[in-house]
Amino acid sequence: MATKNSPSPKPMGTAQGDPGEAGTLPAPEAAGIRDTGSTQLKTKPKKIRKIKALVIDLGSQYCKCGYAGEPRPTYFISSTVGKRSAEMAADAGDNFKETYVGHELLNMEASLKLVNPLKHGVVVDWDCIQNIWEYIFHTAMKIMPEEHAVLVSDPPLSPTSNREKYAELLFETFGIPAMHVTSQALLSIYSYGKTSGLVVESGHGVSHVVPISEGDLLPGLPSRVDYAGCDLTNYLMQLLNEAGHKFSDDHLHIIEHIKKKCCYAALLPEEEMSLGLDELHVDYELPDGKIITIGQERFRCSEMLFKPSLVGCTQPGLPELTATCLARCQGTGFKEEMAANVLLCGGCTMLDGFPERFQRELSLLCPGDSPTVAAAPERKTSVWTGGSILASLQAFQQLWVSKEEFEERGCAAIYSKC
């Protein structure tokens, strides 16, 4: 799998308007909700106006956004925000902004403080979220937010108060007419055309295992571990440096590209270790034209998803976390259903060979359960795709929280519908 001619990676902070090849949405009937329709918002009795809904999936690495009913997001925008210090802003005068998002981060001559508003998938900096959404509405999509309903994804096990924050920001700052916020895991399962299953999601900053039955998260059973794709990238950089290369945090966008183009999960890592360099190596051309050779690092980096102790983490590996969750489903009566529908989601699961390795490890841990692992080709955007399906269904329209409802009932309106 030579990558010598692979395109140079784009710097972090790129607003990527080309989401790639379009897929197809599962039939709404398959998702367990019958009929499709436009978003309809009741503003006054006997008066209904149609509104085009937006779907926003705010991830630790990228914010995916686009219109409901589309097969894939329109934009992938970096979740990193560049901030000028007060001193830098004062020196720059009125000609420079204080905050930079998306393509604005490219080719910046002045150094910026880079801020990621999410920690392990959960929002910790709401000012940056506002900056990102302003960029989405006004720069990327060039829309008036007060003319669109917005569906927002929320990670499992995040504070319930975050849903209130989403509502306050969207209604009070952007003046949107309606919103809904729902679990990322629930949206992911809809992307598979299912309403029941065990969602195993690993993105950039966090991984979850969430059992869902008929559209409901089974209470007390979702599990989370605080490692994911960014940890794999950092581990790959460590392995490459141990092999004699000299990468630093400034080169993480290059390491990320190497991970996507060169790395894989070995089905039998012990056998892979015995292979010679001539059987394993690939050449990779760096942006400056230098060519490096990558060997065992190609598959060794992914081992941390199965043995997190390799990166100093005491939490269980993804197969073990999944097996434990399955065992806990025994008392609910849903174990057999969950084992038959183990659904991989998130960008970290896109690593070549990962589904097969995960299936093997899980089968060894649960020999009596005969677990069946599914890996949809478009699972990198499973959360957004599920949101696109959900927000376009006629049966869902009654679950929008309108601005009027929020003004009248406050946060109670959110919890009654979301």
UniProtKB/Swiss-Prot annotation:
SMART domains: ACTIN. GO terms for cellular component: cytoplasm; cytoskeleton. The keyword Phosphoprotein applies. Residues 1-42 are annotated as: Disordered. InterPro entries: Actin, ATPase_NBD. Testis specific. It is found in: Cytoplasm, Cytoskeleton. The keyword Phosphoprotein applies. Coiled coil: none annotated. Belongs to the actin family. It comes from Mus musculus. It holds the Pfam family Actin. Disulfide bonds: none annotated. Keywords: Cytoplasm, Cytoskeleton, Phosphoprotein. This is Actin-like protein 7B. The modification Phosphoserine is found at residue 8.
